[in-house]
């Protein structure tokens, strides 16, 4: 069996958030088809993809994410990360709604982890143990390029990955 180093824990966190946004009718992926594309663009994207996203779907709301791995000390079998979501929209109320939903989804420590574990991809090697809100910055008073505003929320979470019982290396 070959270890998949491409699949990272933040994929599951982003998937859980996108599912929740769709379930609450806050994002409709049918609105995210660019001309000539057969599949919608995912509105949760790394900062490097923002120029292309804005060129293909100008004016659409999107979420920029960034992930930082945190030190867990000698508990090497556990991992912790902080993911930051920067909601970018032209609608202040929409930004606040997204922040409120993200807060509600991820503020419940082990209960939030249970929810994320229930929507994992069958290929996910991860198990999540807790989530917590680190900080939430409401809608910024200034406007970014193109009339966009933004709001920021940071979430920390703990997880483990399937490992070889003898070597401790990822499976």
Positions of the model-derived regions?
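Hydrophobic beta-strand residues in large extracellular and virion-surface proteins
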Residues: 13, 17, 21, 63-65, ...
């Amino acid at each position: 069996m070959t270890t998949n180093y491409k699949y990272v824990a933040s994929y599951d966190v982003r998937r859980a958030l996108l599912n929740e946004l769709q379930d609450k009718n806050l994002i409709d992926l049918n609105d995210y088809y660019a001309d000539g594309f057969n599949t919608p663009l995912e509105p949760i994207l790394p900062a490097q993809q923002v120029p292309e996203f804005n060129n293909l779907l100008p004016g659409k709301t999107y979420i920029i994410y960034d992930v930082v791995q945190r030190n867990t000390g000698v508990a090497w079998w556990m991992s912790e990360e902080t993911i930051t979501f920067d909601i970018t929209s032209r609608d202040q109320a929409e930004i606040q709604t997204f922040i409120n939903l993200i807060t509600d989804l991820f503020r419940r420590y082990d209960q939030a982890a249970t929810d994320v574990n229930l929507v994992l991809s069958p290929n996910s090697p991860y198990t999540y143990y807790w989530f917590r809100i680190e900080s939430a910055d409401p809608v910024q008073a200034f406007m970014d390029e193109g009339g966009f505003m933004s709001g920021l929320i940071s979430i920390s979470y703990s997880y483990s990955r399937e490992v070889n019982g003898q070597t401790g290396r990822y499976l």
